[in-house]
Amino acid sequence: SIDGVGKVWEYIRYPGKWKDLTDSLDAYFSMKNIYIPRMTTVLTALNVFDIDNLKKFNDTLHYRYNKEAPPAELNFQEVYPMDKGTALIHLPKYLLEEALLQTGITDQARGLIQMGIDNNKENHQKVLAEIEMLDFTRNQNYRNFLDKRIVNWLEGNVL
């Protein structure tokens, strides 16, 4: 599962470092009989605005190791449990609607985001509480990693 690119991945997969992941992928794909890289992403409030970067990384990863076939479509999954604080249903509809505008979005990701809109239970406090708990246990600060639209909403700075 690759749930973001660069600093977004480092935030979600703390204490991992992005370079360590890419080095590990280099080593893995240098082995024989590895033909088609496939990437899965759990879509959450933490990475919903990183879909374009994930798409670019997926395409780069694929062409870097297998130039004979087009890149496989990204596989997106829901966060489990579905009522977790970072679940898409807890974001406001306007943010989810903005997330649908990303150019790299797949039908699968679009469906998950649309489910977040259709089943929306916007809950600012629940999202913020989970993120602050993560930050506290990891000595991180979401402001340094997450998309500015999410940060603005978390801080009540809706534009």
Q: Model regions: which residues?
A:
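Radical SAM enzyme core and accessory elements
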Residues: Q102-L159
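Active-site rim elements
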Residues: W9-Y14, R38-V42, A99-L100, I113-I117, ...
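Extended, charge-rich low-complexity interaction segments
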Residues: P70-Y80, A99-I113
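Radical SAM/AdoMet-radical enzyme domain recognition
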Residues: S1-H90, L95
